[in-house]
């Protein structure tokens, strides 16, 4: 090392290795002049500048431009000259550094994105740049596409949404929507005037429906659950435009109603594709929708207004079902044409008059919404009294091929058997099991449901409310899979119910039975009480004696009693153990049992 005259060591800066190996780009005068010409012609269109320079890549041109622009700006500041006047160059303005709405901008398609360019200051023509496809320019493209997409967000917003929507909807039906213009997305968003008119129609239908339910004498009170779920319906289509416009105004859409019915599956599919739960509800409700919605006067079955009204009513039915019963399970549409439609005079006296007036699409759809709404409300009100209403049902409902309603529950017959088991008391005769079921339901719902008695007085309920109760019972049973009982469990329950007291019912259980039963009913209103003592009819008494005779072969009576009354006690509560220890200390006869706590004790001895 060389030393200074002052004796200090000279600090020699060693170059870093990567700067030694890297060769700096050399720009000749010709290339620089061509670069400046291209700047004047094309601005920041780097691909066109690359074609004009012809010896450098776009990445190299951009880095050179950055250095060149900063150099020009420094010179202009130093000399006090306006930027660009010295070299007669209009430096393109930098990109606006806005924070994007979404931090990672998504590309709308796999094709090349046409980038738009901010114009040159001196008013020369601005040409759109294209995406660079060279592999060595990946870094430049990544830097370039981010600010380009930031500036394009406002312009191409509708294009992006249209493209994304079409890519989703084209899997259902590719011919349903035209992809040529970007204004199709606006048809799927309701304007404020149309939304207010739609809400007006819905409010009128709701008020009419409340008036009709009061006239009808159903002691249900006002409906508290929401009738209408907001559904994304294509408002550009004339199905909903005729709903939102009053019938006196001419329809703004040029299509006819017959054409609308033909395009109905496309609209419904594109609408229900957004929400899969609503799609499930719509398919379930449309499988039970009557094919001919003629009320009082006979209307020809193929007339387009009724068919279009049925189309709009399917969405109304789905939303009403969704609001009333929650999410529905997947059910296949019924092959048999069952579930005969009920006459609309059941729900209100003025329904027939309105059905005869249903010449336009608006009246038909409003009426169908009222009909489905009242049907869903009856399903809700009859849900509590479903077991009590079973007394007034004909016996033919138990046979699977007797009525169309039993076809409707045929696919889920096992679920219906799980809920109310006819053979739970050891007997299959309908008279005894009906009595046991009625007694059980009355005793179970005695303390909590005061409204059951009011509904029990009205035994002349229509067929539809009972079928709705059955359907809602089946659907709620399927949605709770832990309530399902297997066949082996059902056989075990039959054996347990044939005795008076279950093995698990301790004395502590009998003391606090009412409190726990109320808690259980509040928690799970549809659950089956397993610690429930069934009353034995004479037929069941004979059955139990016969079973006892079969079991008693080869056993003495004490063994039989000990086997019948003793069961597996999985865990004992602390209060139970305290009671047992007190009983054992007071009773010297059973004092030996303290040595072996795992031995089984008779319930009769423990209670003395």
Curated annotation (Swiss-Prot):
InterPro entries: Homeodomain-like_sf, Myb_dom, Myb_dom_plants, SANT/Myb, SANT_dom. GO terms for biological process: circadian rhythm; long-day photoperiodism, flowering; negative regulation of circadian rhythm; negative regulation of DNA-templated transcription; positive regulation of DNA-templated transcription; regulation of gene expression; regulation of protein-containing complex assembly; response to cold. CDD domains: SANT. Its main location: nucleus. GO terms for molecular function: cis-regulatory region sequence-specific DNA binding; DNA binding; DNA-binding transcription factor activity; sequence-specific DNA binding. It holds the Pfam family Myb_DNA-binding. Residues 122-152, 189-206, 369-396, 406-421, 440-460 have a biased composition (Basic and acidic residues). It is found in: Nucleus. Keywords: Biological rhythms, DNA-binding, Nucleus, Phosphoprotein, Transcription, Transcription regulation. Transcription factor involved in the circadian clock and in the phytochrome regulation. Binds to the promoter regions of APRR1/TOC1 and TCP21/CHE to repress their transcription. Binds to the promoter regions of CAB2A and CAB2B to promote their transcription. Represses both LHY and itself. Recognizes the promoter of JMJ14 to regulates its expression during the night in a circadian manner. Binds to the promoter of BHLH80/FBH1 and regulates its expression in response to warm temperature, thus contributing to temperature compensation of the circadian clock. This is Protein CCA1. It comes from Arabidopsis thaliana.
């Amino acid at each position: 090392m060389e030393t200074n005259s002052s004796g200090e060591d000279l600090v020699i800066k060693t170059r870093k290795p990567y700067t030694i190996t890297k060769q700096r780009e050399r720009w000749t005068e010709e290339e620089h002049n061509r670069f400046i010409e291209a700047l004047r012609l094309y601005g920041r269109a780097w691909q066109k500048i690359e074609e004009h320079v012809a010896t450098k890549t776009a990445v190299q041109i951009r880095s050179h431009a950055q250095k060149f622009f900063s150099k020009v700006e420094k010179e202009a500041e130093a000399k006090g000259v306006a930027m660009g006047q010295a070299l007669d160059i209009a430096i393109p303005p930098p990109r606006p550094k806005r924070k994007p709405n979404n931090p990672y901008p998504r590309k709308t398609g796999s094709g090349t994105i046409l980038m738009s360019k901010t114009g040159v200051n001196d008013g020369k023509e601005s040409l759109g740049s294209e995406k660079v496809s060279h592999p060595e320019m990946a870094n430049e493209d990544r830097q370039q596409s981010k600010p380009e997409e930031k500036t394009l967000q406002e312009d191409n917003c509708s294009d992006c949404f249209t493209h994304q929507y079409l890519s989703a909807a084209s899997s259902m039906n590719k011919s349903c929507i035209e992809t040529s213009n970007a204004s199709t997305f606006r048809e799927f968003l309701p304007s404020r005037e149309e939304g207010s008119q739609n809400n007006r129609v819905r409010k009128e239908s709701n008020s009419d429906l409340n008036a009709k339910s009061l006239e009808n004498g159903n002691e249900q009170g006002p409906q508290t659950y929401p009738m209408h779920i907001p559904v994304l319906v294509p408002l550009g289509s004339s199905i909903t435009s005729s709903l939102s416009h009053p019938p006196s105004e001419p329809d703004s859409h040029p299509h006819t109603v017959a054409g609308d019915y033909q395009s109905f599956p496309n609209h419904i599919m594109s609408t229900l594709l957004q929400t899969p739960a609503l799609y499930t509800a719509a398919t379930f409700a449309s499988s039970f929708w009557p094919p001919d919605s003629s009320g009082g006067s006979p209307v020809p079955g193929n007339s387009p207004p009724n068919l279009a009204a049925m189309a709009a009513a399917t969405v109304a039915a789905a939303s009403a079902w969704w609001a009333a019963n929650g999410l529905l399970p997947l059910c296949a549409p019924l092959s048999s044409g069952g579930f005969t439609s009920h006459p609309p005079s059941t729900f209100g006296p003025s329904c027939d008059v309105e059905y005869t007036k249903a010449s336009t699409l608006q009246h038909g759809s409003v009426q169908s919404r009222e009909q489905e709404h009242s049907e869903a409300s009856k399903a809700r009100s009859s849900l509590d009294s479903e077991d009590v209403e079973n007394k007034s049902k004909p016996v033919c409902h138990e046979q699977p091929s007797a009525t169309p309603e039993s076809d409707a529950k045929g696919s889920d017959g096992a679920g219906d058997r799980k809920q109310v088991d006819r053979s739970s008391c050891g007997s299959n005769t309908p008279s005894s099991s009906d009595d046991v079921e009625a007694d059980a339901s009355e005793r179970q719902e005695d303390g909590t449901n005061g409204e059951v008695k009011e509904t029990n007085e009205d035994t002349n309920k229509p067929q539809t409310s009972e079928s709705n109760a059955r359907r809602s019972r089946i659907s709620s049973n399927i949605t709770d899979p832990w309530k399902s009982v297997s066949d082996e469990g059902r056989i075990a329950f039959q054996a347990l119910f044939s005795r008076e007291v279950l093995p698990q019912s301790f004395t502590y259980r009998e003391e606090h039975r009412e409190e726990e039963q109320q808690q259980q009913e509040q928690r799970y209103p549809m659950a089956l009480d397993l610690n429930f003592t069934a009353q034995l009819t004479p037929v069941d008494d004979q059955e139990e004696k016969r079973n006892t005779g079969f079991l008693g072969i080869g056993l003495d009576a004490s063994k039989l009693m000990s086997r019948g009354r003793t069961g597996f006690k999985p865990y004992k509560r602390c209060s139970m153990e305290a009671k047992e220890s007190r009983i054992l200390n007071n009773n010297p006869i059973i004092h030996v049992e303290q040595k072996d706590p795992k031995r089984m004790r008779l319930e009769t001895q423990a209670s003395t």
